[in-house]
């Protein structure tokens, strides 16, 4: 753990994106970020999608500062401040209990943070979850805080607590008013279902018009469907989804994933005024998935959409190549044919004429910008090599950030 030696007061970590298959939408406490229902997610592999964060503390720093993707941001942002306060509170608490490893001097030091995503920020790719999980995890190592970090990460972004673990993760809504029991826990490790694959169909990398925070507040205030969903639908779905994962029941997993995505977006439409995160391409992808499955006479592919138009596709290893070919057929790459597929290697295959007929889609060139092929992955990692630091010895971002 970090000590008072200057070189030990800089830590760099990475954290993953997670994709909910049972959705979180709506808070019962805005300040503590406590959800109106439990949720369940899949952690994606950091080889393809991750946030990298460096945090440094020094007696020479005069103020807290943060840089995101190379640009300095307002460190006074309320959720960022909530994370910093919570970590420092835990560090003080640890010190007051007489823990010999707690940092005696550094609690008063200011912190500099630099963070970068290797994927589009604020485009419905769960960037805030990875970002705040990485912040919490990195700050914990700098300040010598151990134990569960759900509360710290949750203060930044609710779903961030799910990115603190790899594999398949449940965020329990909890019952206590102070949120102490609203925590994330792993229900299966990343190696549990090795055949499972994930494809992210990037429809738009633009910032979404209605942010998640505002969207949730409006839905909680106006949607009766959301209340019914949280109280009467989600509890049973959490049990069923856990069973599907533990038993590797892909058919049931896939169908429930799609139904829950559809119901989440139905609550957005039930919100007043209505919110629509999906666009025409999103709806064409939904149609493509159902036609692909109908052709095969079984559910081989599932979609889910968060608060944005990008599709996340779940399938098994033996179906990836054919479905990627179906996407290429339906959404021919506009100009970047050789860069259309990123991430894991996928062998090209030819679609059968029968499948082309079943898809029956009018090609929509450029509708899908690119595909990221990935799989289930581990939780946050510490990067021990100092060459990975995003901050220089002076505590300022490295020039090549």
UniProtKB/Swiss-Prot annotation:
Segments for region (Disordered): 382-401
Protein EC: 4.1.1.33
Any one GO biological process: isoprenoid biosynthetic process
Substrates-to-products reaction catalysed: (R)-5-diphosphomevalonate + ATP = isopentenyl diphosphate + ADP + phosphate + CO2
Enzyme kind, highest EC tier: lyase
Localization per record: Cytoplasm
Residues carrying N-acetylalanine: 2
Entry GO MF terms: ATP binding; diphosphomevalonate decarboxylase activity; Hsp70 protein binding; protein homodimerization activity
UniProt: (R)-5-diphosphomevalonate binding residues: 24-27, 79, 157-162, 213
Pathways per UniProt: Steroid biosynthesis; cholesterol biosynthesis
The organism's place on the tree of life at top rank: Eukaryota
GO cellular component: cytosol; peroxisomal matrix; peroxisome
Keywords tagged on the record: Acetylation, ATP-binding, Cholesterol biosynthesis, Cholesterol metabolism, Cytoplasm, Lipid biosynthesis, Lipid metabolism, Lyase, Nucleotide-binding, Steroid biosynthesis, Steroid metabolism, Sterol biosynthesis, Sterol metabolism
KW Plastid (keyword) present: no
Subunit structure: Homodimer.
Family annotation (NCBIfam families): mevDPdecarb
The protein's role, per its UniProt record: Catalyzes the ATP dependent decarboxylation of (R)-5-diphosphomevalonate to form isopentenyl diphosphate (IPP). Functions in the mevalonate (MVA) pathway leading to isopentenyl diphosphate (IPP), a key precursor for the biosynthesis of isoprenoids and sterol synthesis.
Family: Belongs to the diphosphomevalonate decarboxylase family.
Name the record gives this protein: Diphosphomevalonate decarboxylase
């Amino acid at each position: 753990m970090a000590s008072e030696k200057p070189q030990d007061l800089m830590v760099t970590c990475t954290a993953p994106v997670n994709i909910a298959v049972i959705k979180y939408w709506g808070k019962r406490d805005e300040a503590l970020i406590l959800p109106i229902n439990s949720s369940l997610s899949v952690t994606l592999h950091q080889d393809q999608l991750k946030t990298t964060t460096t945090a440094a503390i020094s007696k020479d720093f005069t103020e807290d500062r943060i840089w995101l993707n190379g640009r300095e941001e307002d460190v006074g942002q309320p959720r960022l401040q909530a994370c910093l306060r919570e970590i420092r509170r835990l560090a003080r608490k640890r010190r007051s209990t007489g823990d010999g490893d707690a940092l005696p001097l550094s609690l008063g030091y200011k912190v500099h943070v630099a963070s970068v995503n290797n994927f589009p920020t604020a485009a419905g790719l769960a960037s805030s979850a990875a970002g705040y999980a990485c912040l919490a995890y990195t700050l914990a190592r700098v300040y010598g805080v151990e134990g569960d970090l759900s509360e710290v990460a949750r203060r930044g972004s609710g779903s961030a607590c799910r990115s603190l673990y790899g594999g398949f993760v449940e965020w329990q809504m909890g019952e206590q008013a102070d949120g102490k029991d609203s925590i994330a826990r792993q229900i299966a490790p990343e190696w549990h279902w090795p055949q499972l694959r994930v494809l992210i169909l990037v429809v738009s990398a633009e910032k979404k018009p209605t942010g998640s925070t505002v969207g949730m507040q409006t839905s909680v205030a106006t949607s009766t469907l959301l209340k019914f969903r949280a109280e009467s639908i989600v509890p049973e779905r959490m049990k069923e989804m856990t069973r599907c994962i533990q038993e590797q029941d892909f058919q049931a997993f896939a169908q429930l994933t799609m139904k829950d995505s559809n119901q989440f977006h139905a609550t957005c439409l039930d919100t007043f005024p209505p919110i629509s995160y999906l666009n025409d391409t999103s709806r064409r992808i939904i149609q493509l998935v159902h036609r692909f499955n109908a052709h095969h006479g079984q559910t081989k592919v599932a979609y889910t959409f968060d608060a944005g138009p990008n599709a996340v596709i779940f399938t098994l290893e033996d179906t990836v190549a054919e479905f990627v070919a179906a996407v290429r057929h339906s959404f021919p790459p506009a100009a970047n044919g050789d860069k259309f597929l990123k991430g894991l290697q996928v062998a090209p295959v030819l679609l059968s004429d029968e499948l082309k007929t079943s898809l029956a889609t009018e090609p929509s060139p450029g509708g899908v910008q690119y595909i990221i092929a990935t799989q289930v992955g581990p939780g946050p990692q510490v990067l021990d090599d100092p060459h990975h630091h995003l901050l220089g010895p002076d505590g300022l971002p490295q020039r090549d950030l």
